[in-house]
Amino acid sequence: MRFFATFFLLAMLVVATKMGPMRIAEARHCESLSHRFKGPCTRDSNCASVCETERFSGGNCHGFRRRCFCTKPC
């Protein structure tokens, strides 16, 4: 019985370490269509740099029409 309890405790410890650290809840991000980006949005990095000039924290290309959407924490 003692062996089983030790084995069970070690198994639980291994399972707990495999789960990894708890994630902290992330802030929500608000999106807005960029007013200064021109042309089709093909690279997220170009979109993000234009959005930073519009006082946003970043930007991504979205949708079928590949438009630039700026993001910031709400």
Swiss-Prot record:
Gene3D superfamilies: Knottin, scorpion toxin-like
PROSITE patterns for the chain: GAMMA_THIONIN (PS00940)
Assigned GO CC terms: extracellular region
Main localization of the protein described in the UniProt heading: secreted
InterPro entries named in the record: Defensin_plant, Scorpion_toxin-like, Scorpion_toxin-like_sf
Coiled coil: none
Compartments it resides in: Secreted
BP GO annotations: defense response; defense response to fungus; killing of cells of another organism
Reported tissue expression: Tuber.
Record keywords, A-Z: Antimicrobial, Disulfide bond, Fungicide, Plant defense, Secreted, Signal
Disulfide bonds: C30-C74, C41-C61, C47-C68, C51-C70
Secreted recorded as keyword: yes
Signal peptide limits: 1-19
Claim: Zinc-finger is one of the keywords in the record: no
UniProt-listed CDD domains: Knot1
TM region positions: none
Similarity-based family: Belongs to the DEFL family. Protease inhibitor I18 (RTI/MTI-2) subfamily.
Protein name according to UniProt: Defensin-like protein P322
Organism whose genome encodes this protein: Solanum tuberosum
